[in-house]
Amino acid sequence: ISFGTHVAGAHGGLIMDMWLRNGSEAALDDLRVQNCVMFRELAGFEVQTNDNKLLLPPYIACHDVEGRRWAITAWTPHQRCWANAPCPCMHSDPQFPDCAPGETQRLKGWFSFYQGVDIVGEIQRLQDLGWDR
């Protein structure tokens, strides 16, 4: 079994590709990934709360203390969005499709920053980019 990731800049953000190759003789199923975006060291985002998070699966976004700077991430195929205030962090966790012997499965991810107040409009703009295809 092998896996890897590739990250490339595009459209003002990062497009991420994660892959899993099944070189075993057994099928792999129910493989979930936790991708944690931690804010502890990011000035303005380090507040330990979930009140600054917006969940629009597969997207999750977090704003700074002023509510004008946002970090946005998403992964597909999507399994769940969640946040952990004590960290503080946010997750858009994907799940690999079942992977038969000899197969390779892929996940697609996005990360970007946004400055402004129309976060829903920005998320729609990101969706319209088609980064997950």
Language model: regions and residue ranges:
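Acidic (Asp/Glu-rich), glycine- and aromatic
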Residues: G9-T49
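Beta-strand secondary-structure signal
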Residues: G4, I15-W19, R106-W110
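A short linear-motif detector with a strong N-terminal bias
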Residues: D17, N50-N52, A85-M90
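Beta-strand-rich recognition/accessory modules
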Residues: H63-R133
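A contiguous pocket-lining binding segment that forms or flanks enzyme active sites
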Residues: R40-D64
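Intrinsically disordered, low-complexity segments enriched in polar/charged residues with Gly/Pro
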Residues: H6-V7, Q48-N50, W82-A85
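Extended, loop-rich substrate-binding clefts of extracytoplasmic carbohydrate-active enzymes
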Residues: I1-H11
